């Protein structure tokens, strides 16, 4: 299987040309079960890249591990719609180099689309994806439903990387078309299904 598939997150980061001072983005459809934000930011840190703006549609307690990357100067700015206490209490002490920019769930994609908050590399966690980058959240062992919060990221970022634990040859009904995707990475797990249904999504 080839297509747009690369061997690792590091290879995707290198191929996307990520360097100091750029902006990376993520969606929050995996909610408290998300592994991808920490996974990618750990790799960015290991590569020695710094002064990154993190644009994420929401951040949960599972992302409290990002504190280490704020302390080390890997993350110097955050744009988000929501932040839970795990990360929020730390940031409220004024440790981030630049103030957090909070946006609404509609305002964030609008700002990406009109260029107010441009994204250099979007990392899209996808429960199912094919080798050409088409992906969906409706199927796969980590299924989360809609990938709507990632639409603007995928379409308007300079480079888009899909990260999946459900790689297939051809996806018949994608939510995001592969024409917007530059690279695909398969990982063992993108998240914990038990945490995907949490908080306001619990019935």
Predicted features by range, described:
Residues 1-203:
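Conserved alpha/beta enzyme-core scaffold
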């Amino acid at each position: 299987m080839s297509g747009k598939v690369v061997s690792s997150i590091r290879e995707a980061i290198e191929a996307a040309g990520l360097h100091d001072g750029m902006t990376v983005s993520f969606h929050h459809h995996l909610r408290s079960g998300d592994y991808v934000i920490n996974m990618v930011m750990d790799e960015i840190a290991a590569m020695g890249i710094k002064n990154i703006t993190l644009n994420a549609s929401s951040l949960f307690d599972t992302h409290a591990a990002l504190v280490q990357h704020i302390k080390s100067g890997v993350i110097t700015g955050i744009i988000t719609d929501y932040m839970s206490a795990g990360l929020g209490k730390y940031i409220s002490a004024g440790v981030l180099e630049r103030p957090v920019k909070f946006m609404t769930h509609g305002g964030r994609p609008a700002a990406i689309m009109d260029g107010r908050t441009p994204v250099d590399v979007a990392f899209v966690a996808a429960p199912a994806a094919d080798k050409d980058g088409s992906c969906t959240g409706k199927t796969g062992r980590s299924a989360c439903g809609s990938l709507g919060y990632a639409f603007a990221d995928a379409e308007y970022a300079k480079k888009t990387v899909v990260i999946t634990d459900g790689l297939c040859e051809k996806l018949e009904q994608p939510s995001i078309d592969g024409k917007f995707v530059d690279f695909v990475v398969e990982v063992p797990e993108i998240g914990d299904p038990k945490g995907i249904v949490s908080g306001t999504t619990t019935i």
